[in-house]
Design a protein with these regions (language model features):
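Polybasic/polar functional segments that serve as interface/processing modules
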Residues: 1-108
Length: 108
């Protein structure tokens, strides 16, 4: 996906806040976090969730990002929450333009 310039130039704390905000708005429950800033550029942010995890990786030099959303459905169906998170991140990262998003999902 192609990110907005604002996101592509963001530091780890900004991206962590973005991920925390969208995860909570989607109704998922964060329990731990990790960030890494790479040299000369690039940022990864991961939130561990009660439901599994979500990761955001930004390649600032290419103005690109990947998002990995994983949810478990052991105690309840979290698929709708994962879909909502994808929509919220699309809005935040690409101003809602999901044309460059590529989806891979396993259900069952």
């Amino acid at each position: 996906m192609t990110t907005t310039d604002a996101i592509a130039s963001s530091a780890a704390p900004t991206l962590l806040h973005l991920l925390q905000t969208t995860v909570q708005a989607a109704g998922l429950t964060p329990v731990a976090e990790a960030t890494a800033t790479f040299s000369p550029q690039g940022v990864s942010v991961v939130l561990l969730l009660e439901e599994s995890h979500v990761a955001l990786h930004v390649w600032t030099e290419y103005c690109k990002a990947t998002v990995d959303i994983h949810v478990c459905d052991y105690q309840q169906d979290n698929y709708a929450k994962a879909q909502k998170l994808a929509v919220l991140l699309a809005i935040a990262l690409t101003d809602g333009d999901r044309a460059q998003w590529h989806y891979s999902e396993i259900t069952g």
